[in-house]
């Protein structure tokens, strides 16, 4: 496994992409890998019966059939049809957790004033969706899971939100506020998370570098590792997943790397 240019945690980076609306200034954003003629040539045809063809979600290249009103949707599914956006169901206690598992629904986009610009609407949604910088500074033990649970808005289908848009800016802002002081983060996954972000911040300063794969540790609310760790790439290829020990983050011997679900529970049934 490459040292850090391997994986990105979908929920955490989606959160970071919106946090920047309330954080400090941003460096140059990273973009998805370009769709080459070769990759486009491998795309399956969209059914002729499809009423609306939409752009692929994430960093994919193949057009898809837009999801209709009421259809199940999520971070990695096809986009909702025009005029709809993917939202967690009312009363859902963990909205983003549900969206990352395709348990949202395509619903009408909320009406916006005619004078509202794309930037201002994103900014207002960001402020409403995430914990403010002041709240973060007063809660140095705030975890990834707590942050994710505070996030409940997804970009409307007409908007194209880069996965890693200004993610490092949020880290830089947190560093400035001493939120990410490694001495304050005692648990292993939390410490590795911010070390990786620091390396990514340094890598982004190198002009001309095009980085399409990243790794961010997937931490639980206690600062340890989720047993399932996955990669997400910006080149449209499905990422690998693997299993680790929650207390150390080290890969479980004999466990496989797969582009699907590695079923990590099976290894704990054996080892416990």
Swiss-Prot record:
Record bears the keyword Phosphoprotein: yes
Protein's name in the database: Insulin-like growth factor-binding protein 1
GO CC term (a single one): Golgi apparatus
Biological-process GO terms, alphabetical: insulin receptor signaling pathway; positive regulation of cell growth; response to insulin; tissue regeneration
Thyroglobulin type-1 domain ranges (all copies): 186-264
Keyword annotations from UniProtKB, A to Z: Disulfide bond, Growth factor binding, Phosphoprotein, Secreted, Signal
Modified residues (Phosphoserine): 139, 157, 169, 255
Modified residues (Phosphotyrosine): 171
């Amino acid at each position: 496994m490459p040292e850090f240019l391997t994986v990105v945690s979908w929920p955490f980076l989606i959160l970071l992409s919106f946090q920047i609306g309330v954080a400090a200034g941003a460096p140059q954003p990273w973009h998805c890998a370009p769709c080459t003629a070769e990759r486009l040539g491998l795309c399956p045809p969209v059914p002729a019966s499809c009423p609306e063809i939409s752009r692929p979600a994430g960093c994919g290249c193949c057009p898809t059939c837009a999801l209709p009103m009421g259809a199940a949707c999520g971070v990695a599914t096809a986009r909702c049809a025009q005029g709809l956006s993917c939202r967690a169901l009312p009363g859902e206690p963990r909205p983003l957790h549900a969206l990352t598992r395709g348990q949202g629904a395509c619903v009408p986009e909320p009406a916006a004033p005619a004078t509202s610009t794309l930037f201002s609407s994103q900014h207002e949604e960001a402020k409403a969706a995430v914990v403010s910088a002041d709240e973060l500074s007063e809660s140095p033990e705030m975890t990834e899971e707590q942050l994710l649970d505070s996030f409940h808005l997804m970009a409307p289908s007409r908007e194209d939100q880069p996965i890693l848009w200004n993610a490092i800016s949020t880290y830089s802002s947190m560093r400035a506020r001493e939120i990410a002081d490694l001495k304050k983060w005692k648990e292993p996954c939390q410490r590795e998370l911010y070390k990786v972000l620091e390396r990514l911040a340094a890598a982004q300063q190198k002009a001309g570098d095009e980085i399409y794969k990243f790794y961010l540790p997937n931490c639980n609310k206690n600062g340890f590792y989720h047993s399932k760790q996955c990669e997400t790439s910006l080149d449209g290829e499905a990422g690998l997943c693997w299993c680790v020990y929650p207390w150390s983050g080290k890969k479980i011997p004999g466990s496989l790397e797969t582009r699907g679900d590695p079923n990590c529970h099976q290894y704990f049934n054996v080892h416990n």
